[in-house]
A protein has these predicted regions:
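A short linear boundary/processing microfeature
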Residues: 39-40, 48, 83, 130, ...
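Alpha-helical elements of the RecA-like P-loop NTPase motor core of helicases
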Residues: 32, 135, 163
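A short, Lys/Arg-enriched interface patch at domain edges and termini
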Residues: 156-177
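Short, proline-centered helix/strand-breaking motifs
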Residues: 9-11, 134, 158, 176
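Short beta->alpha linker loops
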Residues: 28-29, 50, 72, 128
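Alpha-helical interaction elements
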Residues: 65-157
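Short, charged/polar connector segments at secondary-structure boundaries
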Residues: 1-47, 53-67
Length: 179
């Protein structure tokens, strides 16, 4: 309703799309609201950035939302970490990287993320662990049916073991109602 009356106050952030037009980096919801309000134009800021920088920008924008699900935070942290690991690399010039070098780069990236996000390195790594959960269990975390700490522990199980856990939980719930 306010968008209908005064328009979009905060500009969308976009970058040029190589195939023509623009890619929205921040402001998808504002654009949708503007379209629903019948607006034909919205203010934008055009930024030049490569794919990794765009991913980091989008993730940072999403993480600033107030109501973000644990799964959204988990995948956002994982995406940002992957993009940070790629930044500044030229794959055509890179020699074979050792697992030790990869581990050091990962720790450096997590430390930088920790500073930027105001979240401990351990907590960031624990959120990223949630991306190893099967979708059914991850949904239960988002719905607050499984708490964060037990979910992190479940993430260390193989997908088949997670399914067995889920079946055991369903059975226990069903037998509880039968008694």
């Amino acid at each position: 309703e306010s968008i209908k009356q005064i328009g979009v106050v905060s500009p969308l952030i976009v970058r040029p799309d190589p195939e023509g037009g623009f890619e929205i980096l921040s402001g998808h919801r504002r654009l949708h609201a503007a379209q629903l309000a019948g607006l034909e134009t919205v203010p934008v800021i055009v930024k030049e950035m490569d794919d990794d920088a765009a991913i980091i920008f989008m993730v940072d924008s999403n993480l600033q939302r107030e109501n973000i699900l644990p799964s959204e935070r988990a995948f956002s942290y994982k995406m940002k970490l992957e993009a940070m690991k790629h930044q500044g690399e030229r794959s055509d010039l890179q020699p074979e990287t050792t697992s030790r070098q990869l581990g050091e780069k990962l720790q450096t990236s997590v430390a930088v993320m920790s500073e930027e996000m105001g979240e401990s390195q351990r907590q960031i790594q624990r959120f990223i662990r949630l991306t190893n959960l099967i979708p059914e269990i991850l949904d239960m975390v988002d719905e607050k049916k499984i708490a964060f700490n037990p979910a992190v522990e479940l993430s260390y199980l193989k997908p088949s073991e997670q399914k067995e856990f889920l079946e055991a939980m369903d059975y226990a719930q069903a037998s509880h109602y039968l008694s």
